[in-house]
Amino acid sequence: MYAQNTQTDAERERESKMLEAFLPTLDARKSKFVGQPAKKLFDVIRGSAFKIRNIGTESTSPWAEYKGKTYVYGLSLFNKPVQQAMKDKEVYIIRIILDVRWESSAFWDAASHAGPAWMEAIVRKCLDVKVLDVSWEHFYIPERTTSSEK
């Protein structure tokens, strides 16, 4: 499920085609995941072409929460590490909304203690939590320009 972060252009192209075939099946099977432990969804992802190369969280806004705290309520799984996504100007993302509300700083603190296995630690933490929603997107990263370049 977790992959090496280095790939050739040909490997990335092959993976992209497999992802384009796999990800729409998540939409078709969504009802099989919602209300079930996240382990069922992660088992499907583990057996697919989608390799987790980065994880982010779905979190509440500090503006909406008491004392500016933020809470984790889901995960964003990325098929590329940040540097590669920025270079390629695209990334596939699976978003999983969970029936949970973890305080963000404690969540990330616990993950950081796992060292290089931090992504695996995050997934393990979520396995028994019920899935409320799952979606995906092929996100294109826009070209960044400064005001002096315009």
Where do the PLM segments sit?
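Bacterial Sec-dependent N-terminal signal peptides
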Residues: 1-10
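A cross-family detector of function-defining hotspots
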Residues: 33-150
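Sparse, context-dependent recognition of short Cys/His-centered cofactor- or disulfide-binding micro-motifs
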Residues: 11, 18, 26, 60, ...
